[in-house]
């Protein structure tokens, strides 16, 4: 008679033991889940009011500021119970009300309790004030955001660990007391009907904000973000671990109103129209932005000492991208019409700058990293350039003094079908230059 080998018998014994252990483990998990569910519905829900002081303490630890809860009730309908909190107040360092939330709804489950989270948080009709004083100090709901608060990281981790966080019909006030360049501080701005959703499944973060600005600003706009981070990351709120894209959709916007609050190099602009923009983020750092714009009555100053550029209309795609040691800017199908009736035919442009590596330079105050700008490498590609239009607007765009004088004196006409240029150093005085292209109908 054939007998099973000892090794074979050992294998089957181990397999049977493991199977039995896994079965008992599965049963134990279901039993624990059932006990947690019963404890939730039979112990916590009926006595939720007794947990209010303890809940205030735990929430205060997470938020990093004192939190007071006026009232808390629980409703057990179906598998997942819901909790309602009223008159939730966050206090500042002086004990004053920094933020008041009239009504908060929270749904929990046994699984979320084991993770110290909730299934969903819904906040209705909150009102938030954001202020920047004359010294640049930023406060949100009366809380100083300029402080290096160690608790802020824990609060962000907790927030972005919640499966779903929803805000409906909120009100946000932005008060800026700091002068904007050469202009006085702008008037307060209020965003109404603010809706916000944050979903955080596994290692993803899905964000959406919709808000209605004042009528003079334009129409309701939408901001959306989709990010991922490593599954091994233990800090869900650490933005430096996030990689993804932000999308902005403005159905109608008045650039002149934005210029009162956001100003670049002390310059301002005007224009009414639509804009969509996509911004890419890698490990918390900006990498590129693509914007589709369609504006009318454009009036912008593009640099110090330049005349305003006035256009009847402008449309096309604008792209900015960060390189390893420089940047790249381009346009696609850019079209515009000047106030004099001249039309830009809709060509494409691409400009890139690669900066030289920085070197340590000894100074009286210590070693400083510097780079020689005369060694910077520049590349330019374009097609369908109307020389007459360029000549007309030359003193309104940042081309350099020498280029301005040359175009003004020559007043060229014609079309550059294609052009490619490569140079090193400053455009006014390059140390090396190569260029080639095709020009039609040139007149000087």
Which positions does each model-derived feature cover?
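Short coil-to-beta-strand
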Residues: 241-251, 291, 378-380
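Outer-membrane beta-barrel proteins
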Residues: 108-112, 231, 279-283, 355-357, ...
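N-terminal type II signal-anchor transmembrane helix
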Residues: 2-63, 128, 385
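Transmembrane beta-barrel strands of outer-membrane/channel proteins
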Residues: 123, 248-250, 293-295, 382, ...
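Secondary-structure transition motifs
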Residues: 2-13, 65-66, 82, 87-200, ...
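Short extracytoplasmic
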Residues: 58-86
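Solvent-exposed beta-strand/coil patches in large extracellular/periplasmic or lumenal scaffold regions
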Residues: 142-181, 194, 199-214, 276-283, ...
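Short, proline-centered helix/strand-breaking motifs
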Residues: 59, 252-257
């Amino acid at each position: 008679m054939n007998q099973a080998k000892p090794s074979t018998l050992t294998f089957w014994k181990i397999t049977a033991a493991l199977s039995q252990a896994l079965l008992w483990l599965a049963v134990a998990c279901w039993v624990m889940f059932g006990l947690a569910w019963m404890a939730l519905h039979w112990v916590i829900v009926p006595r939720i009011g007794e947990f209010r002081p303890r809940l205030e303490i735990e929430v205060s630890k997470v938020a990093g500021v004192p939190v007071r809860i006026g009232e808390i009730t629980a409703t057990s309908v179906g598998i997942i119970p819901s909790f309602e909190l009223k008159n939730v107040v966050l206090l500042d360092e002086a004990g004053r009300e920094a933020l008041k939330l009239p009504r908060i709804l929270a749904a929990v489950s046994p699984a979320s309790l084991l993770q110290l989270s909730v299934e969903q948080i819904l906040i209705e009709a909150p009102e938030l004030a954001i202020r920047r004083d004359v010294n640049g100090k930023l406060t949100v709901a009366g809380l100083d955001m300029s402080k290096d608060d160690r608790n802020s990281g824990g609060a962000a981790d907790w927030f972005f660990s919640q499966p779903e966080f929803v805000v409906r019909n909120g009100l946000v006030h932005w008060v800026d007391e700091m002068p904007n360049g050469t202009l006085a501080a702008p008037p307060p701005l209020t965003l109404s009907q603010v809706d916000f959703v944050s979903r955080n499944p596994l290692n993803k973060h899905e964000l959406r904000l919709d808000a209605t600005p004042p009528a003079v600003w334009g129409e309701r706009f939408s901001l959306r973000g989709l990010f991922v981070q490593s599954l091994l990351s233990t800090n869900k709120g650490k933005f430096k671990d996030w990689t993804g894209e932000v999308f902005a959709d403005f159905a109608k916007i008045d650039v002149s109103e934005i210029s009162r609050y956001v100003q670049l190099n002390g310059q301002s602009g005007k224009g009414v129209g639509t804009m969509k923009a996509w911004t890419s983020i890698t490990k918390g750092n900006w990498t590129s932005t693509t914007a589709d714009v369609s504006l009318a009555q454009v009036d912008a100053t593009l640099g110090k000492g330049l005349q305003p550029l006035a256009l009847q209309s402008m449309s096309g795609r604008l792209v900015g991208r960060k390189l390893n040691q420089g940047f790249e800017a381009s346009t696609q199908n850019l079209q515009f019409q000047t106030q004099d009736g001249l039309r830009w035919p809709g060509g494409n442009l691409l400009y890139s700058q690669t900066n030289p590596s920085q070197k340590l330079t000894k100074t009286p105050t210590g070693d400083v990293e510097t780079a020689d700008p005369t060694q910077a490498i520049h590349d330019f590609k374009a097609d369908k350039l109307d020389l007459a239009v360029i000549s007309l607007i030359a003193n309104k765009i940042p081309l350099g003094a020498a280029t301005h004088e040359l175009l003004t004196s020559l007043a060229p006409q014609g079309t550059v079908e294609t052009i490619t240029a490569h140079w090193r150093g400053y455009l006014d005085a390059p140390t090396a230059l190569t260029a080639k292209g095709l020009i039609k109908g040139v007149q000087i």
